[in-house]
């Protein structure tokens, strides 16, 4: 007979379908789970499986007893509860059905080539601490004024234009440290002729969808850039993005790759994606080459080698380039 597919979400309740696509938030409610016998599904597939350590996912996983469980994630080394020594692999009994890392995916031509430019950002007081002391409110305000100053706005715009993009017009993402900064920068960019919008987690699904439509489509009120803090780090798929600008310190190789990855989907009329990373004087800078190389050994010599000759180590048409001051900053962080 015919096979029926359906959804279980806040709005859809197709509980009797053969193949059900569900959001964890909805399915994990007890009254929804209990509509199903525990052995109802032969197979359960969990997307964004690095969240499987979260309570809502656990509740669903503990309830069902399928013959087969599969988890899919781009970041298996990341987990929600951040407890050292516990990991996602354990949850899936250390069975890895298939694994592909950035380097290999580039070699296999699964991703769009990227041109990465690590360039000098203006110096600011390091993000949270000065000489081991927390920043005063005054210093934080000064940082904020500085990060959103006309001078820096002009500098960012010049660099973005200089490094360019592939395609008829820019369809860009800009990652900022804080939502206030994203909102303020967006205002200033708009004053200078860019068409931008700042999005945050508090924006509705609809607002986000509308923004993406405007970014991607050429026949409606177009957007050049969406500014955000981390809303685009996972689960959002916009293959058309042809420029990614990083205006924030790198927190971890994982987050860095997730943000870079926003530009790596292939799309028509997009030959490559340009990544412009503004490298300030941050102590985490050494994570950038680690992320780009996929080298998890954290070996200092490898990190240095990668900064100096990244191009020869990255497969395909992609390129990596650090300006001199950025190289210095990374060497200092190592």
Task: Go through the PLM ranges and name each one.
Residues 1-7:
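Conserved helix-turn-beta segment of the N-terminal RecA-like "Helicase ATP-binding" lobe
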Residues 94-173:
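Conserved interdomain linker/interface between the two RecA-like ATPase lobes of SF2 helicase motors
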Residues 253-258, 262-292:
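Conserved segment of the helicase C-terminal RecA-like domain
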Residues 10-43, 54-59:
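Conserved helix/coil segment N-terminal to the catalytic DExD/H
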Residues 42, 51-116:
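Post-DEXD/H (motif II) to motif III coupling segment of the RecA-like Helicase ATP-binding lobe
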Residues 7-16, 32, 183-185, 194-232:
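Conserved helicase ATPase core of P-loop NTP-dependent helicases/translocases
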Residues 152-155, 162, 167, 287-334:
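Long, largely alpha-helical accessory region at the distal end of helicase-like NTP-driven motors
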Residues 224-249, 255-258, 273-277:
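A short beta-strand element within the Helicase C-terminal
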């Amino acid at each position: 007979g015919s096979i029926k597919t359906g959804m279980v979400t806040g709005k859809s309740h197709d509980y009797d379908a053969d193949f059900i696509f569900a959001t964890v938030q909805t399915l994990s409610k007890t009254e929804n789970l209990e509509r199903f016998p525990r052995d109802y599904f032969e197979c359960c597939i969990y997307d964004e499986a690095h969240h499987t350590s979260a309570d809502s996912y656990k509740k669903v996983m503990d309830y069902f007893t399928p013959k087969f469980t599969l988890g899919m994630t781009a970041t298996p080394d990341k987990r929600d509860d951040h407890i050292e020594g516990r990991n996602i692999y354990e949850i899936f009994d250390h069975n890895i059905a298939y694994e592909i890392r950035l380097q290999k995916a580039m070699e296999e031509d699964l991703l769009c080539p990227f041109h990465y430019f690590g360039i000098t950002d203006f110096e600011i007081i390091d993000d949270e601490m000065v000489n081991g002391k927390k920043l005063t409110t005054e210093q934080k305000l000064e940082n904020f004024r500085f990060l959103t100053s006309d001078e820096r706005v002009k500098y960012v715009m010049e660099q973005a234009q200089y490094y360019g993009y592939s395609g008829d017009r820019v369809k860009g993402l800009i990652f900022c440290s804080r939502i206030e900064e994203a909102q303020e920068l967006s205002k200033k960019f708009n004053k200078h002729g860019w068409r931008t919008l700042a999005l945050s987690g508090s924006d509705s699904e609809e607002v986000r969808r509308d923004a993406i439509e405007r970014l991607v489509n050429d026949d409606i009120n177009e957007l050049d850039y969406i500014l955000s803090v981390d809303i685009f780090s996972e689960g959002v798929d916009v293959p058309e993005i042809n420029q990614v600008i990083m205006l924030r310190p790198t927190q971890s190789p994982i987050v860095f790759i997730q943000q870079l990855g926003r530009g790596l989907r292939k799309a028509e009329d997009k030959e490559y994606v340009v990544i412009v990373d503004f490298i300030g004087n941050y102590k985490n800078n050494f994570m950038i080459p680690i992320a780009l190389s996929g080298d998890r050994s954290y070996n200092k010599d490898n990190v240095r080698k990668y900064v100096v000759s990244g191009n020869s180590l990255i497969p395909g048409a992609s390129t990596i380039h650090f300006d001199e001051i950025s190289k210095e900053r990374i060497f200092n962080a190592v």
